[in-house]
Amino acid sequence: MTSLEPRLTWGALPDSLRTLGRWITIVQVVGYTTSLAFVWHTTRLTPVGVEGQYRGTDPGATEAAMQFPKSLTQMLTLTHTHLLGMAVIFVLSGLGLALCSWPSDRWKRLLIAEPFVTLLVSFSAMWLMRYLDPRFSWLLVASSSLLALTFYLHSFLVLRELAR
């Protein structure tokens, strides 16, 4: 795109679409933060806690304790719902970021692609940790942390742009 071509940015959109973008972002931040609170509550965001969540800590644990080994059906359900749901979250936040006037297009492309790659790494690590080696819990914690940081950066940049 040359510098003479018009750019589609939040500033060029009607107020109604800016309001929609603002509220979608706010609700996503609340929802994502709530999900992180749940993860903290169930795993303490540690590799040992994550391992216990998926591999189980006690073979006799009840489902109410949520620290039992996840079955193949549970792993498939968890992966299916979370992967598709999180992809939608990052489509929306990526669209919002694409409409921002800053950062540069190169950085925007990197920030838009990053969560999709990290989602695949996170869910691969979850499966590898569950069925192959518990040490993959470190990769799951690291990739999920990067995913959260990227989400909050997307949200900050979009809300900053919409506050102008």
Where are these regions (language model features)?
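Polytopic transmembrane helical bundles with strong interfacial aromatic enrichment
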Residues: 2-67, 72-74, 96-99, 110-118, ...
